Amino acid sequence: MFDIGWTELLVIAVVLIVVVGPKDLPPMLRAFGKMTQRARKVAGEFRAQFDEALREAELDDVRQTISDAQKLNPVSSLREAMNPLRQMGNEIKADLQKATAVTENKTEVPSAAMSAPTPSMSLPETPPVVPTPAPAPEPAAVAAETVAAKPKAPRKPRAKAADKAAFAIAAPVENPPAEKPKRTTAARKPAAPKTPVQTKKKKDEA
């Protein structure tokens, strides 16, 4: 342990016997033995603690390696690599859907314009109110009111009546009736030559 040989141990024992004496040497050896035992125990405990620390460090290292191995899962790395590709695919799909929706709307607009709206034949819940005509005034009363409202015209002198008669007689003379258009006579047929018998008869009649 201390790299001491037999000769060195004998020298130490002789020195102790001379210094301590033969009476006090046995209890001193016992105390020395107890001290060595305690030192061994302390060394053993220190060694045990050191070993436990090493084991814990190794376990920590092992745990770290295990956690690193779990983190280095190829599935998760592949998923992370595929995420941008999925996003690009989703964007392309969204653009295609928008384009198809726009074309469908364009095709639906003319078809909707061509289709005539169907008239609604629903009847009203309440019947329409027909306005009642106001009672017309009686014709006799109306005539009486008009007669009462019109003032009587003053009588004209008789001289004016005579002038009117003369004017009525002179009017047709001044404005003669328009001549009637002559009727167009049809083309006369040429007269047949008179026979001597007819000429004789005419002379006799004359």
Swiss-Prot record:
Q: Does the keyword Cell inner membrane apply?
A: yes
Where is the stretch described as Disordered?
Answer: 104-206
Swiss-Prot/TrEMBL keywords = Cell inner membrane, Cell membrane, Membrane, Protein transport, Translocation, Transmembrane, Transmembrane helix, Transport
Entry's Gene Ontology molecular function annotations: protein transmembrane transporter activity
Gene3D superfamilies xref list: 1.20.5.3310
Provide ranges: composition bias, Pro residues: 125-138
- What role does this protein play? Part of the twin-arginine translocation (Tat) system that transports large folded proteins containing a characteristic twin-arginine motif in their signal peptide across membranes. Together with TatC, TatB is part of a receptor directly interacting with Tat signal peptides. TatB may form an oligomeric binding site that transiently accommodates folded Tat precursor proteins before their translocation.
Name by which UniProt lists this protein: Sec-independent protein translocase protein TatB
Query: Which organism was this protein described from?
Result: Rhizobium etli (strain ATCC 51251 / DSM 11541 / JCM 21823 / NBRC 15573 / CFN 42)
